């Protein structure tokens, strides 16, 4: 042992000091600080990691650094053993993983516990078949222009690990969630494109859940549902964006469940995105929620200041426009919600500058940015509408969702349906599902009742308008 101590905490502290110098700060904080040293026996160091996924990620991305550290601190015969805490979301991978240290640069020997589930690589199509397959991927949305910061670092790291070995890691399925415009779609395309680069024989498919639902509806109308399901079951890497749009569409959910199960059992990679975590997908079938809750779930946070500045700098370079630092800082500090809003504000600023023939100084930027931010509409949700209607009509939300036929409760329920149809992009089925499991015909009837009553009853119309004002504010 090179480090003259038998205290495991001292040995791991020595390892951390070296690691801090050879990996970047984000990686150090994310992947090494959570590790707990357990024991040192001879030349074998045992560490406790939060999950099997954590362990696999370390092996896949930091094995060379770990070899270096083990060699310097423990010696050339060092070995590293992980005790992975078993979490309920990943029951497939219990047990311990051992990685023999190779400080002399030799090949590492990875020994997995025998009770780990055997993982099959996807059956590969021929090269020509995979290349001819329409992936629906956008080549402009790649890892090279997916800018990284604290808010998306873990999601990107996991996506890159998956792309290196799709379907052959514990990160399957991979569930990405976060607010609209934070980069979920970009990351999905980048992951798919990287798989195509590294594994040209694999069939990769990106599809929005809206398109999936439209294709299913067409197949149902034409009596070709089996062909529809068979098409999706041939895919090696399936990426479905905005899975929350399947809420309330029970038949489409059933078809998706069949595809999901088939691909999962064959070891194919599944990637899903949503604006909320699986447990909050009210209106999704319980068995689907259970499958998704068992995925590796990673949230992309809203862009931090560092990321907003970097995006603005890169976009201005690409557009050939030079902006003063004070202008960049003002935009970055005041347009905070998402990347889409940030880029839209920059485009608006440049366009206004060209149209009026005025140089972009701080005064000009403040005027345009304030207009853009003020014009940005607040996202309206059904939950927000329920709260507003409950307050105005003095009916509890749970009463609205109940089976009660009392006139005041029915009326409040119908107002929620009416305003949800008017102010959100949710389907009638999704609205009905969130209003106590009602069908689209009930929602449509409720909307008509509200419209008719508003035409005849000024007091009722005033109450509906008050609810709308609450929603807007």
Curated annotation (Swiss-Prot):
UniProt keyword Nucleotide-binding, yes or no: yes
Gene3D superfamilies: 1.10.1750.10, 1.10.8.60, 3.30.300.180, P-loop containing nucleotide triphosphate hydrolases
Chief location: cytoplasm
Domain IV, binds dsDNA: annotated span: 354-473
Compartment(s): Cytoplasm
Cellular component GO terms held in the UniProt record: cytoplasm; plasma membrane
GO molecular function list: ATP binding; ATP hydrolysis activity; DNA replication origin binding; lipid binding
Entry binding sites for ATP: 181, 183-185
Entry annotated with the keyword Nucleotide-binding: yes
InterPro entries (alphabetical): AAA+_ATPase, Chromosome_initiator_DnaA, Chromosome_initiator_DnaA-like, Chromosome_initiator_DnaA_CS, DnaA_C, DnaA_dom, DnaA_N_dom, DnaA_N_sf
Domain II: region residues: 76-135
Positions of the UniProt region annotated as Domain I, interacts with DnaA modulators: 1-76
Region ranges (Domain III, AAA+ region): 136-353
Keywords linked to the UniProt accession: ATP-binding, Cytoplasm, DNA replication, DNA-binding, Lipid-binding, Nucleotide-binding
Membership in a protein family: Belongs to the DnaA family.
Protein role: Plays an essential role in the initiation and regulation of chromosomal replication. ATP-DnaA binds to the origin of replication (oriC) to initiate formation of the DNA replication initiation complex once per cell cycle. Binds the DnaA box (a 9 base pair repeat at the origin) and separates the double-stranded (ds)DNA. Forms a right-handed helical filament on oriC DNA; dsDNA binds to the exterior of the filament while single-stranded (ss)DNA is stabiized in the filament's interior.
Recorded domain comment: Domain I is involved in oligomerization and binding regulators, domain II is flexibile and of varying length in different bacteria, domain III forms the AAA+ region, while domain IV binds dsDNA.
Protein name as annotated: Chromosomal replication initiator protein DnaA
Organism, as annotated: Porphyromonas gingivalis (strain ATCC BAA-308 / W83)
Encoding gene, per UniProt annotation: dnaA
